Amino acid sequence: MRLVQLSRHSIAFPSPEGALREPNGLLALGGDLSPARLLMAYQRGIFPWFSPGDPILWWSPDPRAVLWPEQFHLSRSMKRFHQRSPYRVTLNHAFGEVIEGCASDRDEGTWITSSIVRAYHQLHELGHAHSIEVWQENTLVGGMYGVAQGALFCGESMFSRAENASKTALLVFCQDFAHSGGKLIDCQVLNNHTASLGAVDIPRRDYLDYLSVLRGYRLPERFWVPRVLFPGG
């Protein structure tokens, strides 16, 4: 296994099965963040992650963290909180504010560079990247964003500036996504936060099998139209 240098003249990627074991999932470097290349990456189970000053790095880890939306773990305390929630949750109302929130709310630094922000703005404008916003009155207090692949949603990042705000974003999205035919959420790499919410590791090969099937599914035509998700009308 060796790290592949991508060409700027082709959006082709090597097979994810050729990714390095250490660091886990590193597959390629270089290329660019054009919409066509990003979409090709997601279609193949690959995503970009790199620090400021580094070349663009492309990853497909094994195992892969996923969340089945019906299996979101709703703790008793979160259930009580949500029943009296002070929040309003919307879809695709403030993509730019959400990705900037994810970029800025990282004490240890961020991988969401200005080039990443620009690239995902382009994907959003093309109808492929989407945001979930959590509002307290008129203030954005949390949210998440990611890339749609049919009935699979590739979660990229989330942030929280108030109690349970990011949990609320994921909970409400899971409920709405599942209700409309969504099947799986890609969480990329398992961490304590996503594990506490029900995410689990599966073999990369299984993830790629799910992706190949689910990306061909179609959600209702107006699913990604900007709207209020919570509270219901």
From Swiss-Prot:
GO terms for biological process: protein catabolic process. InterPro entries: Acyl_CoA_acyltransferase, Leu/Phe-tRNA_Trfase, Leu/Phe-tRNA_Trfase_C, Leu/Phe-tRNA_Trfase_N. Keywords: Acyltransferase, Cytoplasm, Transferase. Its main location: cytoplasm. SUPFAM superfamilies: Acyl-CoA N-acyltransferases (Nat). One of its GO terms (cellular component) is cytoplasm. The keyword Acyltransferase applies. It comes from the Bacteria. Belongs to the L/F-transferase family. This is Leucyl/phenylalanyl-tRNA--protein transferase. The lineage of its organism: Bacteria, Pseudomonadati, Pseudomonadota, Gammaproteobacteria, Enterobacterales. The gene is aat.
